[in-house]
Structures are given as C-alpha cells and as structure tokens.
C-alpha cells in the first residue's frame, strides 16, 4: 500500500504507480498516451477473421472498423448470428489490448456503466455503504494499469477495452448519457474525465479516460422487442458499422467455384458433396437471418457485411 507521500507524487505525475487502485487522479498523467496502431493492421485483422471462420464480403468493412477505432469508439450492428461479438474480440487481439466483457440488459442504469453505492459488510460484520465502480470505470482502471506496464515491460498488452454485448437491450441514452462529453473523440484531456460522486476517498473522485481506451459495442438491430432509440448526441460518439449476412448470391457463387475446383483437383472432388451440403446449410441459415432484418437502429454506416461460417 502506498503512503501519503507516494500518492501525492502519483497525483503530481512525478512518480508512476504499478496500479491506479489507490488513486484515480493520477490517471491524468497517462491519459494522453496515444493508441499504438499495429503495423499492417488491415492484413492482420483480415487474417485473424479468416482463421476464425468469418466471412466479409467487402474490405471496406475492415477499413471502416480500423478508421473508427483510430477515431474513437465503434458499434457493430446487425442481425444475430453474424459474428459481431467474435469480431469484437478478434479486433482487441489484433490491436494487442485486453478486454472487459459485459452483456447489457433492460435493467441497466448509470450504476452499471459508471458506478454507485452498494451495501456490504466490514471486517466486524457490520453493514456499510461503499462505492462500486461500473463496467466503464473498471475497464478504464485496467486500461491505465496496462498502459504503464506496457511502457516499461516487453510483451504487455497496451491497454484494456470494454466490449459491450447486446447493447440494444438497455436504454442506451439513460445508461451512457452522463458520458457524452467524456466520450467525445475531440474532447480535451480536461473534458475526458468522469466524476465519481460515490467514492468517499478524494483521490478516487475523478478518473481520466485514456486516449488508448475504446468501447466496442455489439447491437442486434432487428429484434423489435429490444431495440432502443439512440440519440444524435450519443450516435456522434460512436462509429456505427453494419455487420450483415453475406449477399444473397454469395453461396451460389461459392458452390459454382467448388464445382470448378473439383474438375481439376481430384482430392477436392472427393469432398465436393460435403462442401455442397455445408454451403446449402449456411445459405438457409443466412436466408433466415436476412428475412428478419427489417428494423433499423442507430446510424448505419452502409459499409459492407460480415457473416459467420459456423
């Protein structure tokens, strides 16, 4: 545990802690460290997606994901079964960041995103009220710890991102509205701060969002029972990218390609029947998804599609 003198040095930026658990104020001094963009990031992401069995019909999907992350936070929106959550985790791996995963629901409030008060028992068994950080703040703290470790230790991940699944199930503006200014990609360091009213320790009543921190949301925008409106204020804080099933003629083209390969490659001819059955199965699954794709939510990027093979 750090003593008062050490915490003062952390807060002034003259000394860097191994962890920011004891003083959030010190996060100001590493908040400006830029996100490292991996060399050849496009091809690395493309290979990672292909290795996982995902299909993308247009390279612009990946280019827009990368551009969106360089700018700030992104939301992957589309029907279920198109690989949005898997894609989000692959993105984190390619960018060399750890991630905190959470699944939203209709009961979420700012308590879940930022934090609030909760009862607990102290060492004497008495009930006390303490502050509890929400998913955003917890992920930011992990991000700050990794930023410092990455600066001084080889092989460390460069940060921690928050992956939010089923984002459409919560009242998005109510849950994240208090973060509007702080989440702005053009916000200054002074603005990229979250006030934590529920923390009693004055060293923990404010936390700065690192430049390296990102939120990747995944939204099912076709479920009429769970599609919540997104205000223009919040939509400007995220880049929305459509993750859709493959084009209707994609599987016919793949079947045709398989037949052509079978004419010249004997080993492939033996597998042709299995390949055709697999293609037919995938086509039916994606046709079913496409039929349900009738509701729009958020701000569509209109930038291509990604489909899940498996």
Language model: regions and residue ranges:
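C-terminal regulatory/interaction module of P-loop NTP-utilizing enzymes
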Residues: 1-310
